């Protein structure tokens, strides 16, 4: 083989000898001086690294070629380095998990974590036409592909550094453990229901009644929420009726609402949006009070509406022996409003809604905007502590100092206590709606927390984006005890179709796997469905219906998967595969070859080495062996060393000869029979006996 001296290669590449020596050391190639010789393999790698135009072309070409199916990755075997430790070896079908942080997505750092020389990785990929540099940054996808070739599966873990947002959250968790500090907090109420059933009219009636009792004059502006007093106790209403906003808030981890008022018109009954609103509230696990509205209308039927509540939603009224509070009202005339408010206070008392009454405030942003006159504005509902003018605040990646507070009447106030909705002037930028607001001790702390939150958001977006569960992931997830439920939202073109789907899906369930239909409905997939899917980590299934343009945009932003089908058998087939993906894989023992010990070599300080003639199949160092003598099994264990002549190898096929050292076993004799086997994990399948027809 031709040899090239270091200085000769440096001259060829038009770089200094020192630069080349540094490059070689980075690749893990040790050289003593400019006169050191390099073999052709190393020369080719270095030349390849410096041929930038070829590199660009090869990388572009490799982008498609290096994408392998999971099966190909599992079947690929990389030769184990001679000195690789036993615990690093990969058993067929088993993946070793390597936990790394986002900052460790670099080739040299990844190689170090895998305990594989970076020069070997560079060389292995160079032979495939892929040029890698030791210090180059890697995308998560590329890092996973490289790791898989050496028997590893990557898991990205949070960097071990103080998270100031988490610290603020834990601070309140600790305070809540001391029940002696807690007091009753005014409930926050959201009104939901079908369009035209009177949600806005109800909110207006409650608001106007409260104002009339106190003073002349209306509210000068809407800040997104208001509060009323009933028998000396406060109730806060979010003045943005609609379950989309409610669920969007929950999808972002903010639970502002304590109680939901479900409005149902007595002359119309339970409608599709009523079902939708109920499912949103049920998913959030908040108490529901039903307000049967429009009882003043001639064709109103309270009893018929109660019947529909029980049959369609499972909400059985208290006077029917159930546990759902149902209040007949007329938002138009005011009838029943006082009773409804009293029921809200009763439910709040039973729910034991608590807060920390003093100290630094915490709240939830429910509205935000940029005002040309005063700059960023944000409406917050205070959940804990006292918010005052002059406080330093942070909400997500935004921060500031409270310059002014305004109540729902537009009046400036000095402070806000738990349950109060107030508008804040003083943020550096418009904060995200539904962000958690914290009061901190200084402007520097506020800046630090906001900067950390911003950086965290960037890293999360860079790593994986905002993405919820996907159906195909369930098809291969397997083995995760904590994941045995598949959440679905079903939309179809007719009631008959959706009912047929629900019945068919129910037959797919077993003791091990479960499908939870979070919501079902008729018609186009809309933005409300997407927000519910985001909140409940569900997949949306459309049967003979499609998403509207807003839903498609929203799904892309939220990372929610929408699957649309025209044939019910295709839908059921995908669900079967998804459910099978939830099952623990089955480990099987597979015999892959046989051999016979023809010679035994006794080596001092090493032990007995078997000279083996392979009779059929193959032997792999990562597998196992059973040894039989006179048809009796005398050993079943691992292979410590596998050699072909003097070379350590990972696999040998019949009819070749090889040398084998058995792990912790030396009692071998000529004529012993060997049976080689491997352990594989195989996907389990479910035997479904459902019968379904296309609706």
From Swiss-Prot:
Chain residue ranges for the region called G2: 218-222
Function: One of the essential components for the initiation of protein synthesis. Protects formylmethionyl-tRNA from spontaneous hydrolysis and promotes its binding to the 30S ribosomal subunits. Also involved in the hydrolysis of GTP during the formation of the 70S ribosomal complex.
Region (G5) location: 330-332
Family: Belongs to the TRAFAC class translation factor GTPase superfamily. Classic translation factor GTPase family. IF-2 subfamily.
GO MF, one example: translation initiation factor activity
Region of interest (G4), ranges: 293-296
CDD domains: IF2_eIF5B, IF2_mtIF2_II, mtIF2_IVc
Residues covered by region (G1): 193-200
Segments of this protein annotated with the region G3: 239-242
Protein's name according to its UniProt entry: Translation initiation factor IF-2
Cellular component terms (Gene Ontology): cytosol
Limits of the tr-type G domain: 184-358
Binding positions for GTP per the UniProt entry: 193-200, 239-243, 293-296
Entry keywords, A to Z: Cytoplasm, GTP-binding, Initiation factor, Nucleotide-binding, Protein biosynthesis
Compartment list: Cytoplasm
Spans annotated as Disordered: 60-92
Gene that encodes it: infB
The species this protein was found in: Kosmotoga olearia (strain ATCC BAA-1733 / DSM 21960 / TBF 19.5.1)
